[in-house]
Amino acid sequence: MNVPVAISGGGIIGNYISLRLKRNNIDSLIIEKSDYMPDMSEGIRTLTLNNHSMSLLKAEGIDIESAPINEINALDGEGTGKIQFLADDINESHLSHVVMFNDLKNRLTELCKDKTLFNNEINSIQKFNSEDTSEAILKDGDSLHAQIIAGCDGRNSNIAKITGLPNEHYEYKQTAITFIGHVINNNNSLIAHQAFSEKGIFALMPMPNKDSKKNRYTIVWSIDNSILQNISPTEYVKNNLSFFESKLNIKIEVNSEILNFKLSNHHFKNYIKDSVVLIGDAAHSIHPLAGQGINLGLADADIFCEEIINAYNKGLKINNKAILKKYEIRRKGMNLLMLKSMDFFVDFFSSKNLYIILLRNFGLNSVNKTKFLKAFFMRHASGLNKF
């Protein structure tokens, strides 16, 4: 087989790239290790898409049900600090949109199924070549020749392992607890909440209203691993949910199973090796504090496609090293900045030091009074500042 772009991983990022390239007359083939089996259950996993991510998906004909957010309120549960972000302050109708992961994944998979090899995987790359084509050996024994091999296969990327590129990894020593909650006394379903305290980082995001189910929220609650040594996540939620209900002045009913996963980040020092490119979680991951992981991945995919399409339209080789390097340069700095920023906020808002608590309360209140600073943060988080 011979194809201009081989995409390892049929997730959201890989499928998006395939659709974008197809619209611009560049053929691609997705190699996906799982079977073609759409998950028709709603699930509890959600994604928070910023305005830029939504516009990228809509340009490819992806328009799924979402819960818009036009206000985000963040407060310090150990003091009086708070900050309010409003879409009106940056002349936008919304700050972000929450979608169901399965809805988006199923829609993309359906659109790309004819360009996907399911139940297969790239086992090795026999020849890395940025001048001609690279040769990949698949799990079924077939070989594949491609000008570019795009690793979009997630944070445990097999393609990343094959490249041998250096990688930095950090364990936060935290666990994220996530579940769906019904907010009983809620008068505005367009508001997201975030609270920081010694009981963890608590985020409450509205969910799409399906089958007349209203006032449903997805909760992501990050706590220190040490807390769960003698108590289960379910018991911890049962014993401590009232603390955040009191802080946010709401009542929450747990409406789903309670899941949990360990938190860590990683970042590759380089995103390319000859004609092999790492994109999205294959190249980097961050703390879910701000829900920016998927947005960074789609921003990667956007710039990757932009550079490849520009080269193709100019009659240049799409795997020219200078072109692929432009993608790396444009995205690596932004991703690293977001990763380091999240690490700072996690440490800052997890601290139990009294002086740090006083400082962050002062900081939140000061930024809340400074419109241009708030506007800068909001425009950046919304993906409106493109580099």
Predicted regions and their residues:
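C-terminal helical "tail/cap" subdomain of flavin- and related membrane-associated enzymes
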Residues: 306-387
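Beta1/beta-strand and adjacent pyrophosphate-binding region of the FAD-binding site
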Residues: 1-11
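Conserved N-terminal helical subregion
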Residues: 55-59, 67-162, 170-178
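FAD/FMN-dependent oxidoreductases across multiple families
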Residues: 227-312, 319
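N-terminal Rossmann-fold NAD(P) dinucleotide-binding loop
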Residues: 14-15
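Residues at the starts of beta-strands that form the adenosine-phosphate
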Residues: 4, 27, 215-216
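Glycine-rich FAD pyrophosphate-binding loop
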Residues: 22-43
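Conserved FAD-binding catalytic core of PHBH/FMO-like flavoproteins
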Residues: 149-249, 258
